[in-house]
Amino acid sequence: MKRLCVFCGSSPGARPAYRDVAADLGRALARGGFGLVFGGSKVGLMGILADAVLEARGDVVGVIPQALMKKELAHTGLTELRVVASMHERKQTMADLSDGFIALPGGMGTIEELTEVLTWAQLGLHRKPCGLLNVEGYYDRFIGFLDHAVAERFVTPAHRSMIVVASTPDELLEAFRTYQAPIVDKWIDRAAT
């Protein structure tokens, strides 16, 4: 793995722990030799993360749609900033440039980006690791939702296992290094339909 895509908030969030883990993840990525691919903003957790990678002399590629250049305040000090035409192109470009995906705390955009790459994994479009950095239980209810979806037979246990959950950057990156995508022969249980 050379580059990891991180989805996270353009807000710093309510707790200092969110900002701290964004900086910790940035340093861990650089220390581990991973480049960062992210949404290209200099504000919120995105900016904290990118700055930490850059301060640790790591490579950072930002991908931002033209429409968000001013709204999200594009980070101009990156290794590379790619300006694309749309949100769809942003997500596809980020996915194409990355060998795995991590979600830090964030809002609707973060959840949407994460669930899209999980869906792509479920459909067999990629076999890259997808992970949650569950800071102070931020994603506990989302994880509970996934477990509920398994219990209600909307998600298979194999597909549920595609998401790696950790509470520290080092733990998550170690899990990514050893990640083996589950082999799923079918994604619909015909007996249950």
Language-model segments: which ranges?
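A cross-family phosphate/adenosyl-ligand binding-site feature
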Residues: 1-97, 135-170, 174-175, 179-193
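Flexible, glycine/proline-enriched loop segments at strand-loop-helix junctions
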Residues: 104-105, 129-133, 160-163
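Gly/Pro- and small hydrophobic-enriched strand-loop and loop-to-helix capping segments
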Residues: 59-61, 123-134
